[in-house]
A protein has these predicted regions:
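Intrinsically disordered, low-complexity N-terminal regions enriched in serine/proline/glycine
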Residues: 4, 27, 158-160
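Intrinsically disordered, low-complexity regions
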Residues: 9, 17, 34, 112-117
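Short linear interaction motif-like sites in intrinsically disordered regions of transcription factors
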Residues: 2, 60-63, 125
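Beta-strand elements within well-structured catalytic alpha/beta cores of enzymes
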Residues: 10-25, 65, 94
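Short, charged/polar micro-motifs that form catalytic or ligand-binding hotspots
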Residues: 11, 15, 55, 80-84
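His/Asp/Glu-rich, glycine-adjacent segments
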Residues: 68-170
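Short, Lys/Arg-enriched N-terminal segments with co-localized hydrophobic residues
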Residues: 1-9
Length: 170
């Protein structure tokens, strides 16, 4: 006689929306009849961590969200400062609890994952992507584009990479 097993598959999707006005967004959710987004909107959790305006910068707030610490506790106050932080992020916590973790451009987060499914850092944080070819070239194109934005430079190499990325994913 064979034994039966129940396999529980747990999924968590964290979508980070930066500087969204939810009053306006809700109107679009209603007009476009996007039920999934409307359901997410019903279950929003509002939190407070800072009470001074200078601590409300998104790169500070996102690191607070990723670590569960206040700005004072994590000490990250500028874009890219996360690389100096020793705080454990949600990504490592999830991986330690046997979840597969992937991240695309989570602001001011660092790749301390042992085995990411994928990891593409934000363009301002000097941390590595995962080891896949596509994550590496997407990271390179993002960083080059953002960091050379003021000079309006876009290299031929990046155009070629974009074509490769487009052909692979679109």
């Amino acid at each position: 006689m064979s034994e039966g097993y129940i396999v529980l598959v747990m999924q968590l999707v964290l979508i980070e929306l930066n500087e969204i006005n939810f009053e306006y967004a809700k109107k679009y959710f209603d007009i476009l009849k996007i039920d999934t987004i409307k359901n997410i909107n019903k279950e929003l959790i509002e939190t407070e961590s800072e009470n001074s305006d200078e601590m409300l910068e998104p790169w500070i707030q996102w690191h607070s969200i990723h670590t569960g610490c206040t700005a004072k506790d994590h000490g990250v106050f500028r874009l890219g400062d996360a690389i100096n932080s020793k705080k454990i992020q949600i990504f490592e916590e999830l991986e330690a609890n046997h979840l597969t973790v992937g991240s695309i451009s989570a602001m001011n987060s660092i790749n301390n994952l042992k085995n990411p499914s994928y990891f593409i850092p934000d363009p301002w944080t000097n941390t590595k992507s995962d080891d896949s070819f596509f994550s590496k070239i997407i990271t390179l194109v993002l960083k080059d584009t953002v960091n050379n934005n003021a000079s309006a430079k876009f290299s031929i190499k990046n155009y070629i990479y974009l074509i490769i990325i487009f052909l692979r994913f679109v």
